[in-house]
Amino acid sequence: MYIVCVSIIIVCIWGCLGNGTVIWLLGFRIQRTPFTTYILNLAIADFGLLAVDFTLEIRWLQNRKQDEGIVFEFFEDIFQCMYNTGQFLLTAISIDRCVCILFPLWYRCYRSPRLSTILCALIWIFSFIFPGIHFILFLTAKKEHKYIRCYQYIVNGFICLPLMTFSTLILFIKFCFKTQRIRRRKLITVILLTLLFFLSFSFPMNAFYISHYIFESPTLHRIQYGYLCATLNSSVNPLIYFLVGRPKRGKPRRSMKVILQNVFKEEESHPDETAPSAETKL
């Protein structure tokens, strides 16, 4: 447990630095687009999750046991809110890219530029519902608060997992059958890698929580490994942006700002992606 806890703390520090850089650049240094609104909110959710988890792990190192009480439950519910937000945002991102690929003409001509902002606001509000109910029930000493998180993870599993898996498959199939020019697009590569890492790292925590509340299995060790997977998932996205967006060998190095611009402003500089679909419909 000590090794896992220290590993989580190291990953949290690294992830906070990466996501903090993304938040600073996308929020204040780079002109925002509808799609980068999703990425900015995702970075905020990941940063919040890592900061809260860092606090929880420090408290565990001090006490060497599972913390309890109002302070712990408050931070735990904030963690759950950030975790929910990340899941729903990635689901929205995957659906957004699928619509962009399957219906490119409609996406460019009729999609509202404010849609991403509205969806992000709704996702944040919805993500607070289950943790908020859990904290209120905890304060009123209701035993039902123990099962709220189980319901939360069941809802996440039935909503996010099928939609994200289906969208990832569509994106992967389209990516494989596109021309070499489109296949080299960095944005679709970033999205696919982000979704694959999320499906690999983030959903084990759903399984750990559901198995605990349904089968009443011991939690501490399993939940710690779930936290480790969640922190890895929240920390890996800035690294993906950097590795995919960096220039090839032999070319001069670029700043992180230029790398993010190359990755997330790609769809604006490639309007010809919709040409085949438009010509087919005409």
Model segments located where?
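The cytoplasmic-loop to transmembrane-helix boundary for the fourth helix
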Residues: 102-129
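Internal alpha-helical transmembrane segments of multi-pass membrane proteins, especially GPCRs
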Residues: 40-43, 117-121, 151-155, 188-196
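Helix-to-loop junction signature of class
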Residues: 5-12, 25, 48-65, 79, ...
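Extracellular N-terminal segment of 7TM GPCRs
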Residues: 1-20, 60-61, 74, 137-143, ...
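Intracellular effector-coupling site of seven-transmembrane GPCRs
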Residues: 166-203, 207, 259-264
